[in-house]
Structure formats: C-alpha cells, structure tokens
Amino acid sequence: MQVDIGCCKGESVILAYNFLHPGEELNEGGDFFEDYPVDLGKPILVPGYTFMRIRTIVEPYGLLPDLLNMIIFDALVANSDRHQDNWGLCFKEDQVRLAPLYDHGSSLGWSLNEDRVRKIMSNNRMFEAFINRGMSLIRLEEGHKINHFNLITGIKNREDMGLRNATKTISAVNKDSVWNIIKLVPDDIMSDLRREFVFRLLLERKACIERLVN
C-alpha cells in the first residue's frame, strides 16, 4: 500500500492511499463475524477471535498463505492491534484477495517515550523482556491472550510447512535493508535513538521468528 509522510497544520501525518482496484469492494474482517456488535461505535474484539476461526474465513478463498504472512509480519513489527477491522478481503466478481495490510500504528514500541527507549536500550535484560512482551490480538484459544511468539509456536503445530513458507517473506530483512529504510524517515519523525531501537527490534524479532519456525 502506498503511503506518504507529510505535515498538516504543523502536525506530522501519514497519507495512506486507496488500495482498492477499480470495481473492488472491501469487506473488513468484522463483516464475517455474525456475533460482532457493529453498532457500538468503536471496535471491540469479537468473541472467539482465534487463528482457527479466521482460517475458516480465508481458507475457502485460498488465502491461508496470506493469513500466515500477516501473522508473521505482525510478529516482526510487534503489532498489538490486529483486531477484526484491521484486515479485510477485497472482492471483485469471482476474484478475492487479502487487502494490503494497514493500520500498524500500534507497532515498533509506539507507546514508548524517548526516556523509556533510552532506558531499554541501555539494559540488555530489559530489551530482551520487551522483545518477548508484544501481545497478539489473534489467539489460539478463546480468552487466552498470548504473545506473537507463542501464537507462532501454536500455529506451527498445525501448519508447519505453511508457516515456513510465510517466514520466507521476511528473509530479505537484514541490517542493510532495514537501515536503508529507517534512514529515510525524517529527523522530526524519528530520532537517532529511536532509529537504533527500531533497527535492533526488527532484527532481534526476525531472529526469534526464524528460530521458532525453522
């Protein structure tokens, strides 16, 4: 999905472009849950929001590999907000695809201020604890919230080869590729300290994922 970083009335903003192809219609994940109370005004997690239930939605369209790719990506960036309205399927006549992934605001240590980042970066034990703390909204069993790595471990017992293939999608993540992206972020958006933090976070989480899957 194409995005741009900009400034509006003195505030830093992200412009996310419409990703729908002509004639396509987006159905968000919540549309597939008959017990989702859509009239509450804000998203709440639907009952039974588990990997297996989401699988029953996407697998008839041949999109299980795309679901696994999404789970691996969320684990990589520590996305803690992949609720049912933060993904969807794009329909056009008899064609269906998983929508490009969107809304990753709750990723990469988004809630940490600079002082907290500095403290974590200066203490290896704190950094390791932070790496393992990222929680997934997608669960293995209803009511049991787990971190991304435990989710991957549970899925591996069901979809070993599919998960191995999904992990290949992050094979290009290395020191050079990550830094070449991070260095493009303007200084008023990301400090040098946070660049180093995100750089280390991505590489460490990639290593954790590969150890679990391979």
Positions of the model-derived regions?
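Conserved ATP-binding subdomain of kinase catalytic cores across diverse folds
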Residues: 1-38
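C-terminal catalytic region of ATP-dependent kinase domains
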Residues: 90-214
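Amphipathic, charge-rich alpha-helical segments that serve as recognition/docking helices
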Residues: 28-55
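Short alpha-helical "patches" and their helix-cap loops
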Residues: 2-9, 83-92, 214
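Conserved kinase catalytic-core segment
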Residues: 46-113
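Glycine-rich loops and low-complexity Gly/Arg-rich segments
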Residues: 26-29, 39-43, 114-115, 123-128
